[in-house]
Amino acid sequence: ASFGHLCTLLSTKTYGDLCEMEDSWKEPFSFWNRMRYHTINVSDERSLPLIKKMIAEYMQLFSSNKFNICADETFCLGKYKSKKLAEERGVHRLYIDYVKELAQFLVENGKIPMFWGDIIWNSPELMKELPESMICLNWGYAPEQREDETRAIAQTGAVQYLCPGVCGW
C-alpha cells in the first residue's frame, strides 16, 4: 500500500500525524475502519518522500519488472487534513498528482508501475497523465460487475489487466 490501506503505518506514534484523518488511531479497529480512515495526507510534504523510501526498500526484494503501488480505496482523501487543498484543486487532481509522482519514481527505477483502478473510474481521462507503461489493475466490488469501468479505461488507450475475484481480497 502506498496511499490508502496504511492502517499499520498510520496508527503508529511515529507516522500517525501523516494520516489524512486527525486522530484516526482513536477509531475502533474493524475491517471497515482499517481501510476507511487510513489514507496518507498528500498535503503534508513528508508523505511522498516517506512512501518513496518505503517503495525503494521493497523494490529490492523482488525481481519482477512490475510494481503495484495499489493506490486504491482512498476513501477519506480530501475530507480532513487535505480538505482545503482538495477544495482548491479537486480531489481527483490530488489523487492523480500523487499517483503520478509514485509512478514516475518507479519508471525512473526501471519498473513498470501498476495500480488498482477503482478510484480512476471516476475520472478515466486522467489516465493520459500517467506514464504510458502504467498498468491499471481493474476490478470491482460487485458479484456481477458492469463493463462500464472497463470500457472507460480501454477508451483512454491505457493498458489494463482485468482482475476478477470473489471477495478474495
What are these regions (language model features)?
Residues A1-I135, C167-G168:
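Aromatic-lined carbohydrate-binding surfaces of glycoside hydrolases
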